[in-house]
Amino acid sequence: MEQESELLSLNTLARILTLYFSSEKGTKITPSALELITQYLRIYSKEAVCRAYEEKKNSIMSSSENEDIVLELEDLENGIAAQLALDFS
């Protein structure tokens, strides 16, 4: 597997998760579980960007315009996010 710089630290991820699970007393997460969640989020994010890029590339090619492909937030929101959530569930 390729080496990547850690953009989201495990401490940050743990803090984000505790915001959503703080109502349950004694809920803990192990470092190995944090690593797994980090990998899952990394794969999910890459897949979202790849799908949005391919979708945008196909729409640009069909309109026969010769322009650079630049992704916007809307490209991820329009159809990609819903289908990706279903595929990863």
Swiss-Prot record:
Q: Does the keyword DNA damage apply?
A: yes
Q: Where in the cell is it found?
A: Nucleus; Cytoplasm
Q: What is its main location?
A: nucleus
- Which Gene Ontology biological process is one annotated for this entry? replication fork processing
The reply to whether Metal-binding figures as a keyword in the UniProt entry is no
Q: Which GO terms describe its molecular function?
A: DNA binding; protein heterodimerization activity
List the CDD domains: HFD_CENP-X (cd22921)
User: Which Gene Ontology terms of cellular component type are present?
Assistant: CENP-T-W-S-X complex; cytosol; FANCM-MHF complex; nucleus
**Annotated keywords:** Cytoplasm, DNA damage, DNA recombination, DNA repair, DNA-binding, Meiosis, Nucleus
InterPro entries linked to this entry: CENP-X, Histone-fold
This protein's source sits in the domain of life called Eukaryota
Q: Which family does it belong to?
A: Belongs to the CENP-X/MHF2 family.
Function, in words: Component of a FANCM-MHF complex that promotes gene conversion at blocked replication forks, probably by reversal of the stalled fork. FANCM-MHF promotes non-crossover recombination.
Assembly and partners? The MHF histone-fold complex is a heterotetramer of 2 mhf1-mhf2 heterodimers. Component of the inner kinetochore constitutive centromere-associated network (CCAN) (also known as central kinetochore Sim4 complex in fission yeast), which is composed of at least cnl2, cnp3, cnp20, fta1, fta2, fta3, fta4, fta6, fta7, mal2, mhf1, mhf2, mis6, mis15, mis17, sim4 and wip1.
What name does this protein carry?
Inner kinetochore subunit mhf2
Q: Could you tell me which species this protein originates from? A: Schizosaccharomyces pombe (strain 972 / ATCC 24843)
